[in-house]
């Protein structure tokens, strides 16, 4: 058994210890590592590879799975069969966090199936497992003898009291204004060893605005850039520990066959026949027209080279795509113009409108160029919040953001149905962007479901979803703390030959940052950088890069460029709606009241009898929390008020007095009399001797039955609070009508 340890020093915030161990568990896997975070957190990562390649695949078949075991938290799964089922959202998002830096680290052209399975064995509820899983997956892959350019280190850093803290606990995150997951690897830079950042997933916390108001540092673009730099030393320590383990226990790298997308001879032939016409086609502004022309050219090239490269049609197609990529990048780097004619900082045409779906509680349509997003908001009682049964710290989710990407959004056919990992990831990104500006439960006692429908896609539907969702939430009457917009940035870089004044030529590394990237620019560029935020600070950020590091000044420039675009988009959104609308008449009106905790049982009643009766009779929905908070919802005010009055009558009763008169309902008959409901939870007895109006009766049911209305007066209240009633003659003065209580079992 071999071990390696990384110590994370957070100064006054203490230290965290990450320990990697191999040789004890999963010995038949190509590479297996047990990773520990301090003493309480333990997970196993196992990497395996198929023996033969999938030659017919035109992609790298890497699969990452995260298996949450509920025994890790000492719990039995809540499902019907009491065993784990489909992966939770947290597990799926962790799979994506692992996949994004791992995939580009394998050699190009690899077609053997690679599977990484991470199993959560033990978890302290005060810790998160996702970042530990990134390191474990990298370490196990490093040991497996695979063509892998790792190791990769992953760290979560949170801005707490002005300090970037690595591997923060859940408790510490409550004091953070911003946290980010950063993954990267060690490289040799121009100025010595450095860390190349490969992936970033970041967000402002839910209480960021309150913390800023209290004097905390706002997560501006400058602060976020500082956080990325602060993560690098921690990543270096983690990579060093993984490399130490690999030096002791890694298998020799096996000779895996690779399948290049095309041969050099194919590329030269395609370039010679297609460059001129393809360059012209790539200046067409409209996506549909441009795609149609490039498809036509591709067909011509395939036909022209069919005889020369018979049986190598896939290589011709791949070479045509590579030529397209080269021409797109070349025009950006040399001319600073893009395939749709825009400059590098130009945003496509924007439009925004609200109230586009008639009966929805809130809706909006946001369009940026050919990317079109429909946002729809639904409000409901807090009890409709999502119940979460996973290893994460969240047990309920009040704000749920769901993203749908149907195939027609790109003019194609395909499968529809349950969401894929990409859709779950995009929905989670948009959700994180909006959570920091949502009103508190006290200010807005609703569960909120936000759905983003991608109706048209040509670049960054996730950031379009952020914009459409802000508009729809405001249209639904949700009092957001600030509007949020998002934009996708891109980066193109290359070594460009430049000529000096003396005529000498040299290569110069040139970076060009693009604002509002198209789908093609995303595919052909070096970076996908999505930034969402308010006019004052960043709320969410996602970065994926194919480069071995991005210079700090380039990244800072991209963040600044993104803010300029965000402010422009916010202005367009404000023209459509700049403050919350009145709530839809179809949305429930939810009111919050409080009752004493010791009265909760009385409000609910035996087997829910009282609360069910109030719900049935008033039409209101009622939800009671353990702390005595009661949410009452109804589509009209009178129904909600009637339910509130009934609840208050039980929880905060005003005791009736002798002489008061009521119109009550008979709720129970006995041999000795009839019990009449006066107020919710408050009954009185009309003795059998008082029912006959002076005449003797043999049986109570001969005079009254359950459900009958009786006008009664309180004749006496004994020391135990039991109420004796007498009938009131019809010609007497009118009694005080009280709302009838829900029938309740009375005791003699």
From Swiss-Prot:
Keywords: Cytoplasm, Magnesium, Metal-binding, Nucleotidyltransferase, RNA-binding, Transferase. One of its GO terms (biological process) is mRNA catabolic process. Its cofactor is Mg(2+). Residues 659-728 form the S1 motif domain. The keyword Magnesium applies. Its EC number is 2.7.7.8. Mg(2+) binds at residues 522, 528. Residues 588-647 form the KH domain. It catalyses: RNA(n+1) + phosphate = RNA(n) + a ribonucleoside 5'-diphosphate. It is found in: Cytoplasm. GO terms for cellular component: cytosol. The keyword Cytoplasm applies. GO terms for molecular function: 3'-5'-RNA exonuclease activity; magnesium ion binding; polyribonucleotide nucleotidyltransferase activity; RNA binding. Belongs to the polyribonucleotide nucleotidyltransferase family. Involved in mRNA degradation. Catalyzes the phosphorolysis of single-stranded polyribonucleotides processively in the 3'- to 5'-direction. PANTHER family: POLYRIBONUCLEOTIDE NUCLEOTIDYLTRANSFERASE, POLYRIBONUCLEOTIDE NUCLEOTIDYLTRANSFERASE 1, MITOCHONDRIAL. This is Polyribonucleotide nucleotidyltransferase. It comes from Mycobacterium avium (strain 104).
């Amino acid at each position: 058994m071999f071990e390696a340890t990384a110590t994370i020093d957070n100064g006054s915030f203490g230290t965290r210890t990450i320990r990697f161990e191999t040789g004890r568990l999963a010995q038949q896997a190509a590479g297996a590592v047990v990773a520990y975070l301090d003493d309480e957190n333990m997970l196993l990562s196992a990497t395996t590879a198929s023996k033969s390649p999938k030659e017919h695949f035109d992609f790298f078949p890497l699969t990452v799975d995260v298996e949450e075991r509920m025994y890790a938290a000492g719990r039995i799964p809540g499902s019907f069969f009491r065993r784990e089922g489909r992966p939770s959202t947290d597990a799926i998002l962790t799979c994506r966090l692992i996949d994004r830096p791992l995939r580009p680290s394998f050699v190009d052209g690899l077609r053997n199936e690679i599977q990484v399975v991470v199993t959560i064995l033990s978890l302290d509820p005060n810790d998160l497992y996702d970042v530990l899983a990134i390191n474990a997956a990298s370490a196990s892959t490093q040991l497996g003898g695979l063509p892998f350019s790792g190791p990769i280190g992953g760290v979560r850093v949170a801005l707490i009291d002005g300090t970037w803290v690595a591997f923060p606990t859940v408790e510490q995150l409550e004091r953070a204004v911003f946290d980010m997951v950063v993954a990267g690897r060690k490289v040799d830079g121009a100025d010595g060893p450095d860390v190349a950042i490969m992936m970033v997933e970041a967000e402002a916390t839910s209480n960021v605005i309150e913390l800023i108001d209290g004097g905390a540092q706002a997560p501006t673009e400058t602060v976020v850039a500082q956080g990325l730099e602060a993560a690098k030393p921690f990543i270096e320590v983690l990579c060093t520990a993984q490399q130490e383990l690999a030096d002791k226990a890694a298998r020799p790298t096996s000779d895996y066959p690779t399948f290049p997308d095309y041969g050099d001879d194919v590329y030269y032939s395609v370039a010679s026949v297609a460059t001129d016409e393809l360059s012209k086609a790539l200046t067409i502004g409209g996506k549909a027209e441009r795609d149609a022309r490039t498809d036509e050219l591709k067909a011509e090239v395939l036909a022209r080279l069919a005889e020369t490269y018979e049986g190598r049609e896939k290589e011709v197609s791949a070479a045509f795509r590579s030529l397209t990529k080269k021409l797109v990048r070349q025009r950006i780097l040399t001319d600073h113009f893009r395939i749709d004619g825009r400059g590098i900082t130009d945003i496509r045409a924007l439009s925004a409108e609200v109230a586009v779906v008639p009966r929805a509680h809130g809706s909006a349509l946001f369009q940026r160029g050919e990317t079109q997003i429909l946002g729809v908001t639904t409000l409901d009682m807090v009890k409709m919040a999502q119940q979460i049964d996973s290893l994460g710290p969240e047990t309920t989710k009040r704000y749920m953001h769901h993203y749908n990407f149907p195939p027609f959004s790109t003019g194609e056919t395909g499968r529809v149905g349950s969401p894929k990992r990409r859709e779950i990831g995009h929905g989670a990104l948009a959700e994180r962007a909006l959570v920091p500006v949502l009103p508190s439960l006290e200010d807005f006692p609703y569960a909120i479901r936000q759905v983003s429908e991608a109706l048209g896609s040509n670049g960054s539907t996730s950031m379009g979803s952020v914009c459409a969702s802000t508009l729809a939430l405001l249209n639904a009457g949700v009092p957001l703390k600030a509007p949020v917009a998002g934009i996708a940035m891109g980066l193109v870089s290359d070594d460009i030959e430049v000529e000096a004044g003396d005529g000498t030529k040299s290569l110069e590394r040139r970076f060009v940052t693009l604002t509002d990237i198209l789908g093609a620019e995303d595919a052909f560029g070096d970076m996908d950088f999505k930034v969402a935020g308010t006019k004052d600070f960043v709320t969410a950020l996602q970065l994926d890069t194919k480069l071995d590091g991005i210079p700090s000044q380039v990244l800072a420039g991209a963040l600044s460029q993104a803010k300029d675009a965000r402010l422009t988009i916010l202005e367009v959104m404000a023209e459509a709606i700049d403050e919350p609308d009145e709530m839809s008449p179809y949305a429930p009106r939810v009111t919050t009241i409080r009752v004493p905790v010791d009265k909760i049982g009385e409000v609910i009643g035996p087997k829910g009898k009282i609360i069910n009766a109030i719900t049935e009779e008033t039409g209101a929905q009622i939800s009671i929390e353990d702390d005595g908070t009661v949410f009452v919802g109804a589509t009209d005010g009178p129904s909600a008020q009637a339910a509130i009055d009934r609840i208050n009558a039980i929880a905060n009763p005003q005791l009736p007095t002798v002489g008061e008169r009521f119109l009550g309902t008979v709720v129970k008959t006995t041999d000795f009399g009839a019990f009449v409901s006066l107020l919710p939870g408050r009954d009185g007895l009309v003795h059998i001797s008082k029912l006959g109006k002076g005449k003797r009766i043999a049986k109570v049911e001969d005079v009254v039955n359950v459900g009958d209305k009786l006008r009664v007066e309180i004749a006496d209240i004994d020391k135990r609070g039991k109420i004796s009633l007498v009938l009131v003659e019809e010609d007497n003065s009118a009694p005080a009508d009280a709302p009838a209580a829900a029938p309740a079992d009375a005791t003699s």
